Amino acid sequence: MTRVVVLGGSGFLGSHVADALKRRGYEVHACSRRTGIDASQEQALTAYLQRVNPHILVHCAAHVGGIAYNAKCPVAIFEDNLLLGYAVVRAACRAGIKKLVNIMPNCTYPGDLDLYSEPMWWDGPMHSTVLTYGMPRKALWVHAWACQQEYGLESIHLVLPNLYGPRDHFDAVRSHALGALIHKIVEARQAETKSVEIWGTGGAVREWMYVEDAAEGIVLATECYNNIEILNLGSGKGCSIRELAGMIRELAGWDGEFIYDATKPDG
């Protein structure tokens, strides 16, 4: 039976990836800080991987939040993800992992793009609001590429759109746009508040993917894709923040109005 370690296996995406792998018959070891494994500690992670001896390592761990959180904690986000990525690639090499599957955010694309196509990944800088998160994740790809050249490390790098679904975060600061909108609108309905403030113009278009679909796509790519060049997972269809807010308002049964703060960045 093929053994797989899922880093961040207690988190939103990682827990669903672990579930999807189990359904396909893999022997799955889901690890995270909750299970006593800090993946940013190279020596401890290497020792764990050498003990479990997995064939495949799926990296879903990250220190991540929404735009407001990125603005509040840029140093911690940058340093934590840089150390995490470095430790994961080094440990994968030292433990003799046969395949590293790295999950990438789509904020690693140039910030001025409306459509994300793999050949455009290196065509410009990331948006400043996500730079401290996106840059360490992009550096992980470079590190993995270097280790392929020197040590023969095999890795794939899958770029995902924004995710939603069971086990998501819904606090106003740490969550991404969809989770934050749900939190604000449901809270407004419960408090009988007549308006909700939304950052940006509402015109920004974002692609969304149900987390269980993302997990199935990751498993399929793990089985079928073997190129270090990035691969997008998604439908290629987007939805504006304004449209999204309207759908949530209707489903929540709230009849208030939205106040868009154009002085803030679009979510």
Located regions from the model:
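N-terminal Rossmann NAD(P)H-binding glycine-rich loop of SDR-like oxidoreductase domains
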Residues: 2-24
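C-terminal substrate-binding subdomain of Rossmann-fold SDR/epimerase-dehydratase oxidoreductases
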Residues: 16-23, 187-267
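Adenosine-cofactor binding site in Rossmann-like domains, unifying the SAM/SAH pocket
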Residues: 22, 28-47
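NAD(P)H-binding glycine-rich loop region in Rossmannoid oxidoreductase-like domains
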Residues: 42-81, 94
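Conserved catalytic-site region of short-chain dehydrogenase/reductase
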Residues: 67, 102-117, 132-138, 150, ...
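Conserved Rossmann-fold NAD(P)-dependent oxidoreductase catalytic core, especially the SDR/UDP-sugar
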Residues: 86-130, 156
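Flexible, glycine-rich beta-alpha linker
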Residues: 108-110, 132, 156-180, 204-205
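Active-site Tyr-X1-5-Lys
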Residues: 128-161, 180-191
